[in-house]
Amino acid sequence: MTFDLTFDNRFTRDLPADTEPRNFTRQVHQAGFSRVKPTPVSAPKWVAGSKEVAELIGLDPKWLGSAELTEVLAGNALADGMDPFAMCYGGHQFGNWAGQLGDGRAINLGEVVTADEKHWTLQLKGAGLTPYSRTADGLAVLRSSVREFLCSEAMHHLGVPTTRALSLVLTGEKVLRDMFYDGHPEHELGAIVCRVAPSFIRFGNFEIFASREDTETLQTLVEHTIRSEFSHLLSEPDAEIGPDVIAAMFEEVCRTTAEMVVHWMRVGFVHGVMNTDNMSILGLTIDYGPYGWLEDYDPDWTPNTTDAQGRRYRYAHQPQIAQWNLVALANALVPLVKEAEPLQRGIAVYVEEFQKSWHSMMAGKLGLSKYESETDDELVDSLLTLLQLAETDMTIFYRRLADIELGTREQPVTLELAAVLRHLSEAHYVADEVTEEYQQALMDWMRSYQSRVLADDGFPAEDSQRRQRMNAVNPKYVLRNYLAQLAIDACDKGDDSLVSELLEVLRRPYDDQPGKERFAEKRPEWARHRPGCSMLSCSS
């Protein structure tokens, strides 16, 4: 069966393969991958699919939900042209070198090439044991799979660079998991997500070969990556790939990584586990594990229970961690570039690009035509302080800020506390925290904000135009942690309608969508400390 898909499996063609054909956990040397087939499951059941992703890879959406496609995306069958494999890579986890990691439960089916000659790798997450599974079982549960499926698509529609998700399928089998590693394992429903990306190559793919001083395989991987994903850096297709080209690739990775993290900060996304094996060479958000969304603005928040003490991967620290990870990648490339200076330039590009993109992003969130450091550094700093004085929902605050009438230079509106609070009260979690001191700080900031907006040379003449500009970058709908948990709870009981409804709402996160307002509500009190809503683990 072909589904009218054409496969061109460049990775398995270009990289050396593991010479051991048997599938058992082991150290794999001098190989970019191991060939391994998905483990068949007993009773696959279609839960949800993305029509946009199907069209992206050239798959007729009519196949979504069909028995034939369900069998393939559950790992029970292979379409013609597929060449399944698991990647070998390493990584730094929480700042420490972890050695070989690899695709422990992800199996790549192959690379689809579309009519416009774009390549898309299809990958099943939770498809069974591989040589890289270590002590795990290679499986995934419904809980984590619903979260990955929904967030992959939500992030894309938010405008955040990300891998995509084609499908979510139940396996019909139970999987034993200890959700919080507290000695109380339970059986959960098994599931598989089909992830889609131009490439799933990570920083850790390069690190593993550098750590083993396997320069030959490292060079092969770099050449494959540049010819496949960075061919625009070559003067001609078969041009030699030397240190200059490798340094140019690294510089581009630094730039796209900066852009990705700025988008995370814009929408309040916290990845939760920014290890180098979870960093895409293409600057895509990858591996949706214990991620979370800032609800009340807390720059020190991390959703990952494993990181609860050190908070290495907290929201505000993500830009610095991305830079740390890029340095780790640079160290892996030094054996090929021969010197550090060209790679140090890439790190400088990251710092510069992040700062520039951050300023542009904050200007957009506030409806300004451009960022002026002389005035806006203080305006933004005081805003971020204000958001912490009272527990304030970040998403709702920016959205409702756009609704406050400021007037024009000729006729500025006189800001009144009651009117401002009427707009912003929806964003406050605890009414008692809206003290007189807070109200004074709020009004001081609002007047500074109004003055800055009305002095903006590029400012639209009408409040409605400012509102339109702000609402284009400040989403109304994000995948709030409690919404994902409600979808999981329903799906666990056999009702997948909320997954489909959420997917539909999250396709238009910047639109008002009358009738869907319940999906824009701030976190309810019952979800404040509930597992899955406030904190998550790496158990999946």
From Swiss-Prot:
Cysteine disulfide links: none
GO MF entries: AMPylase activity; ATP binding; magnesium ion binding
Active site, per annotation: 277
Enzyme Commission no: 2.7.7.-, 2.7.7.108
Residues bound to Mg(2+): 278, 287
Annotated residues for binding of ATP: 102, 104-105, 125, 137-138, 195, 202, 287
Superkingdom in the source lineage: Bacteria
Cofactor(s) required, per the database record: Mg(2+); Mn(2+)
Catalytic activity: L-seryl-[protein] + ATP = 3-O-(5'-adenylyl)-L-seryl-[protein] + diphosphate; L-threonyl-[protein] + ATP = 3-O-(5'-adenylyl)-L-threonyl-[protein] + diphosphate; L-tyrosyl-[protein] + ATP = O-(5'-adenylyl)-L-tyrosyl-[protein] + diphosphate; L-histidyl-[protein] + UTP = N(tele)-(5'-uridylyl)-L-histidyl-[protein] + diphosphate
One Pfam entry name: SelO
Keywords: ATP-binding, Magnesium, Manganese, Metal-binding, Nucleotide-binding, Nucleotidyltransferase, Transferase
Enzyme class: transferase
Task performed by this protein: Nucleotidyltransferase involved in the post-translational modification of proteins. It can catalyze the addition of adenosine monophosphate (AMP) or uridine monophosphate (UMP) to a protein, resulting in modifications known as AMPylation and UMPylation.
Membership in a protein family: Belongs to the SELO family.
UniProt-recorded name of the protein: Protein nucleotidyltransferase YdiU
